[in-house]
């Protein structure tokens, strides 16, 4: 199997707290995997670890053929992360934020322009500094930044949050198109009906571990809440 993500007994410590407490996970290239679980289960940490933003303390963790314990920088260039908060450079315009995202991943200016057009970020909006955007606009620009990176691995944390109906439909289209083009997608969501329609399979995270990796996309009861989330997504 050609794997995009391979974790074996992977542990990630935040201080003394094991946010990931021995994760075993295989994700094949081209899969769309729904990551489910209660708040504080470790979903956000798992996605951030896959993005090379959270260190692996022990165990094995390979993403896109790179060892996360040795080469996180190479991983960061090939992934796109949409977190809870829409991280943008507030002093840059929308257009410059997208160009920066494309350049940071080795993508092209044309990719940034295409992402801007696809997300409807044209006209006066392109020239606004990110600091002047509404919450919904920031979310759309952050999604466009992921698209501009042309990532091999999409990491989407509650991706539908903050988008209007048209934006949510567009996001679904983008996920399907990315998977059809060979990209891999991990999305964490509480909107099970919508997210399950996108996913090829789902996994449940609870207590920092994968509890069940064999679920069908059909929603099932969530595990009971555990510890609160200890990670802030930027």
Predicted features along the sequence, with ranges:
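Catalytic Walker B motif of ABC-type/P-loop ATPase nucleotide-binding domains
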Residues: 154-157
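Conserved ABC ATPase "signature" region
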Residues: 99, 109-125
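Conserved ABC ATPase signature
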Residues: 129-133
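Conserved ABC transporter NBD signature motif
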Residues: 59-67, 75
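Helix-to-loop junction immediately C-terminal to a conserved catalytic motif
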Residues: 51
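ABC ATPase C-loop
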Residues: 146-147
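H-loop/switch region of ABC-family ATPase nucleotide-binding domains
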Residues: 189-190
């Amino acid at each position: 199997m050609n794997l995009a993500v391979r974790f074996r007994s992977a542990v990630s410590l935040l201080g003394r707290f094991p946010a990931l407490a021995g994760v075993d996970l295989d994700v094949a290239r081209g899969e769309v995997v729904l990551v489910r679980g209660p708040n504080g289960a470790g979903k956000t940490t798992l996605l951030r670890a896959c993005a090379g933003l959270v260190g692996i303390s022990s165990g094995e963790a390979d993403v896109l053929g790179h060892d996360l314990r040795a080469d996180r920088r190479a991983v960061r260039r090939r992934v796109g992360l949409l977190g809870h908060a829409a991280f943008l450079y507030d002093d840059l315009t929308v257009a410059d934020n997208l160009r920066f995202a494309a350049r940071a991943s080795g993508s092209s200016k044309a990719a940034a322009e295409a992402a801007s057009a696809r997300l409807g970020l044209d006209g006066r909006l392109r020239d606004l500094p990110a600091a002047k955007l509404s919450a919904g606009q920031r979310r759309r620009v952050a999604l466009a930044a992921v698209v501009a990176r042309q990532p091999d691995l999409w990491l989407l944390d509650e991706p539908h949050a903050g988008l209007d109906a048209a934006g949510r439909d567009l996001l679904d289209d983008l996920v399907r198109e990315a998977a059809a083009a060979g990209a891999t997608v991990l999305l964490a969501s509480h909107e099970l009906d919508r997210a399950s329609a996108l996913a090829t399979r789902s996994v449940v995270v609870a207590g920092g571990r994968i509890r069940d990796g064999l679920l069908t996309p059909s929603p099932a009861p969530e595990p009971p809440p555990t510890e609160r989330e200890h990670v802030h997504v930027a």
